[in-house]
Amino acid sequence: MSRKCEICGKGPSTGNNVSHANNKTRTTWYPNLQKVKAKAANGSVSTIKVCTRCIRSGSVTKAL
């Protein structure tokens, strides 16, 4: 199970945390993924991992 959105493909991004003393430590930021029961095009229901941006934009049709 990867940490990727199944709709847009958004995944982890990396960079540095920078302190006031300009010390740098590597870090990883993960997308806010939610497990959602969604309807597919053929009408079947499956659980997928979706980022909150895709949920808010209406890219996912939730199954009720």
From Swiss-Prot:
The keyword Ubl conjugation appears for this protein: no
GO cellular component: ribonucleoprotein complex; ribosome
GO biological process, one term: translation
One term of GO molecular function: structural constituent of ribosome
Keyword Ribosomal protein: yes
Pfam families: Ribosomal_L28
Keyword terms, alphabetized: Ribonucleoprotein, Ribosomal protein
InterPro entries: Bacterial_rp_bL28, Ribosomal_bL28, Ribosomal_bL28/bL31-like_sf, Ribosomal_bL28_bact-type, Ribosomal_bL28_sf
Alphabetized HAMAP family for the sequence: Ribosomal_bL28
Alphabetical list of PANTHER family matching this protein: 50S RIBOSOMAL PROTEIN L28, LARGE RIBOSOMAL SUBUNIT PROTEIN BL28A
NCBIfam families for this protein: L28 (TIGR00009)
Annotated family: Belongs to the bacterial ribosomal protein bL28 family.
Protein name: Large ribosomal subunit protein bL28
